[in-house]
């Protein structure tokens, strides 16, 4: 992940994004200075060099509009809360308070997540979800059969693939070493739907 930006650097980055979106080309240093209310182009240049050092843009000195937004900078980033831990195996009690936040590029997932949950256990490895992963979750109290969900059972939470029947629900692991969890439909609470994952940078 790139270094955190100051408020002013974020404003300059937003200015570049908007110019690319509206005009199809990056602004000049003079245009940035004018839009941002800087006294000179030098102030714009200072912020641009800082953005380059932090990995958001690449400057091309041989071009008049030589500002290239790197992919994650084009979409921007947002801080998503890590709100607890989910056992991918044996359900554990949810931790409701926010442990920390993690910067995630906007547009990384097809559906925008609400929060991240940390996986403990290996019951979903065949679905590509490993111990220590941060799963991106879209908050929802409904889900379709076949979706990977965060489910609450008796005030404990787990992540599994949901299979719905007429009067019951089955939470399916993605590891043959674990048994499916079958519960009455009226005792199952859906907390959210899995929309993707990122490897937790704090796990390495």
From Swiss-Prot:
GO terms for biological process: DNA repair; DNA replication; negative regulation of DNA-templated transcription; proteolysis; SOS response. It is an enzyme of class 3 (hydrolase). The keyword S-adenosyl-L-methionine does not apply. It comes from the Bacteria. InterPro entries: LexA, LexA-like, LexA/Signal_pep-like_sf, LexA_DNA-bd_dom, LexA_repressor, Peptidase_S24_LexA, Peptidase_S24_S26A/B/C, WH-like_DNA-bd_sf. The keyword 4Fe-4S does not apply. HAMAP family: LexA. Represses a number of genes involved in the response to DNA damage (SOS response), including recA and lexA. In the presence of single-stranded DNA, RecA interacts with LexA causing an autocatalytic cleavage which disrupts the DNA-binding part of LexA, leading to derepression of the SOS regulon and eventually DNA repair. This is LexA repressor. The lineage of its organism: Bacteria, Pseudomonadati, Pseudomonadota, Gammaproteobacteria, Oceanospirillales.
